[in-house]
Amino acid sequence: VGVLVVNAATVPTRRDESWRYSDLEAVASVWPVPAAELIEVAAGEHVSRVVVQDAAIDAVAIRDFRVVLHKGATATFHVLNTGGKLGRVAIDVTCHEGSHFELGGAMLGGGDQTLEIVTTLNHIEPNATSNQVVRSVLSGRATGSYLGKVAVSRDAQKTDASQSVKAMLLTRTATANAKPELEIYADDVKCAHGATVGELDAMALFYLASRGIAPAEAKVLLLQAFVAGAFAEIADEAERATVEAAALAALERMLDMSLPQETRASPKTPLPLAGGAGGGPVL
């Protein structure tokens, strides 16, 4: 029997706010984690990143990013978090004057998975904006957590920051945690956040069934529509197709685990990820 020995002083605990919902035993098994990847965007430039976290189901996958946006710079992140016993993506962003950060993220998990998206937006100069859209679909005993802090300094007047967080629970044993947080020291800002947790709309399922669509396939279609808002802005068609295929595969796996073999759906072509952040008639 192996014994795991770690430096307890360095491993996160429940007292660490950004780790409060995490699988700390899994974290300890890979601690210390690599340093955050630094992405520095020069004034007026743009960076776009697509992160697909689909590690093996027994893996521990922790990815950290540190983003610095100089004057007028923009960055767009799209995150699909589906893999691992623990799958965690953390992004720390510093926004200088007139910069913009955009996040579209989704967590799709089942079984005993713990999935996390953790963000910190530091607005330190005026006229910067940020927008975050996160969607979760959870089944089994999975836990999906979004922790997003927006910190606005005294000099960051005219900040405009928003967070939209929605979760869909396919089983009553799944857990969704949402903790949008605002820390504002400026007096001329616009900051908004919203978080909801729900289930598939029975009326929407009934409507699709009345059109001859099998129940399992109907669920996949509705769930695809639900997560669509997180990825609608991916400009590169190849990247969008990659994320779309990975999301569809994750949704089908989740539903397959809870359905008899004869009722399982196998859509041949994923829906295009289009639509507004509301994600269709499912919440």
How should each PLM-predicted stretch be described?
Residues 21, 50, 262-265:
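Positively charged, low-complexity intrinsically disordered regions
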Residues 263-265, 274-277:
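Glycine-biased, low-complexity coil/linker segments
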Residues 269-270:
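N-terminal cationic leader/targeting segments used for protein routing and processing
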